[in-house]
């Protein structure tokens, strides 16, 4: 399962740079959970932020497990954890804007996670397409005044635009890492590891975005 990633596979951890860089998600996830600057009490984001932090922890641990063991189960968890982030972004957007009741949002998140998990299991080669299908709608929603209550020129929404820019750069580096021209298998500086780090930064910027665009009950 590690054939599409540049870094050389050795003993445990199988891919050192990619394994260690996964802890960027753990670091920022713990930051979200313990931050004293969480969205204010009485806002929907105050309830949503811990779920974001837990999802980031899930991504970090799953990614480490995959790159350390290079097992098919680890690969499944790694991709599935990213699916849950995309789903949280989508259902979280509808919930925090009051377009979807909390209970329905949670039920939709769980049901969609099961469905896409089964799709990933049945069609593993479609994992990148499925990830894009899940991630893009949530990003689009968070870019609109329909969800945030603020126009694109508002200073309140800078974090989601910054997160999108970081994610685009990270994705570009991820693609380059799969090219023989940019692949140095024995190097500790791996494009996939940079993808992990920038992806964690982008996820943390979602937390800042929640904090800057709160919705009171």
Give the positions of each predicted feature.
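Multi-pass alpha-helical transmembrane bundles in non-GPCR membrane proteins
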Residues: 1-217
């Amino acid at each position: 399962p590690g054939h599409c990633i540049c870094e050389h596979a050795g003993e445990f951890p199988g891919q050192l740079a990619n394994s260690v860089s996964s802890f960027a998600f753990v670091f920022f996830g713990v930051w979200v959970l313990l931050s004293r600057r969480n969205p204010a009490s009485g806002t929907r984001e105050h309830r949503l932020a811990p779920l974001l932090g837990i999802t980031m922890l899930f991504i970090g641990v799953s990614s480490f497990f995959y790159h350390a063991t290079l097992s098919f189960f680890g690969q499944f968890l790694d991709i599935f954890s990213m699916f849950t982030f995309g789903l949280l972004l989508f259902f979280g957007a509808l919930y925090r804007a009051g377009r979807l009741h909390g209970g329905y949002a949670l039920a939709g998140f769980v049901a969609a996670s099961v469905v896409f998990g089964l799709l990933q299991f049945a069609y593993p080669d479609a994992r990148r397409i499925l990830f894009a299908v899940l991630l893009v709608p949530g990003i689009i929603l968070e870019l609109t005044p329909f969800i945030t209550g603020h126009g694109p020129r508002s200073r309140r929404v800078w974090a989601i635009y910054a997160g999108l820019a970081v994610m685009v750069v990270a994705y570009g580096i991820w693609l380059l890492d799969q090219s023989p021209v940019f692949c140095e298998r024995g190097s500790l500086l791996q494009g996939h590891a940079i993808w992990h780090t920038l992806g964690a930064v982008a996820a943390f910027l979602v937390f800042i975005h929640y904090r800057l665009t709160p919705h009171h009950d």
